[in-house]
């Protein structure tokens, strides 16, 4: 049996530490995305692939990239689902939860099945999206960096990024909810439809 020295284990311990810290970093107030505009992204609705990709202008959006394979993502998702349920009747808000595979382009059928199975097993009522060819992540990475799961962008009604959360911390749900509610003040309430 080989004797493993501490010096030989340093690179492994360093990598494990980086991965662990990525999973618990929380809101990033200096993220390069803050203040930048997010254009349309080539996303596919898992429930209806013919549905148009979400538009960000005019709404407050939480754009979340997560994966069923990612433990911090699985811990964060129930909080996002609770927030989306709480604001379900407010047309000024949308949660765009993008389910991502473990690496490379995602097979749409596989990601749809895996995501549906996960959401059902967790009893999460969530409208999930996919980035099957990885283009949305490529666009975001080229524009202002993307590299950890989960990553959540808070996008204002002017389609600019207002906050970014990378990784997961238990208080993120409350922080995200407060940020969303505050940002909703920038979007006029829509009048209910008139009776005919």
Mark where each language-model region is.
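Thiol-based oxidoreductase modules, predominantly thioredoxin-like and allied folds used
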Residues: 91-109, 124-134
């Amino acid at each position: 049996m080989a004797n493993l020295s501490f010096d030989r284990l340093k690179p492994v311990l360093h990598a494990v530490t980086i991965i662990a810290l990525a999973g618990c970093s929380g809101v990033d107030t200096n993220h390069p995305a803050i203040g930048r505009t997010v254009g349309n992204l080539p996303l596919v609705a898992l429930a209806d692939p013919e549905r148009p990709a979400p538009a960000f202008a005019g709404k407050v959006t939480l754009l979340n990239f997560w994966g069923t394979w990612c433990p911090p993502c699985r811990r964060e998702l129930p909080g996002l689902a609770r927030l989306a349920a709480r604001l379900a009747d407010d047309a000024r808000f949308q949660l765009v939860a993008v389910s991502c595979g473990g690496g490379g382009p995602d097979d749409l059928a596989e990601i749809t099945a895996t995501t549906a199975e996960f959401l059902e097993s967790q009893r999460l009522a969530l409208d999930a999206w996919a980035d099957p060819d990885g283009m949305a992540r490529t666009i975001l990475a080229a524009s202002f960096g993307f590299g950890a799961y989960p990553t959540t962008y808070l996008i204002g009604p002017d389609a600019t990024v207002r906050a970014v959360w990378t990784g997961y911390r238990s208080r993120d749900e409350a922080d995200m909810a407060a940020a969303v509610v505050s940002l909703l003040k920038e979007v006029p309430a829509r009048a209910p439809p008139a009776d005919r």
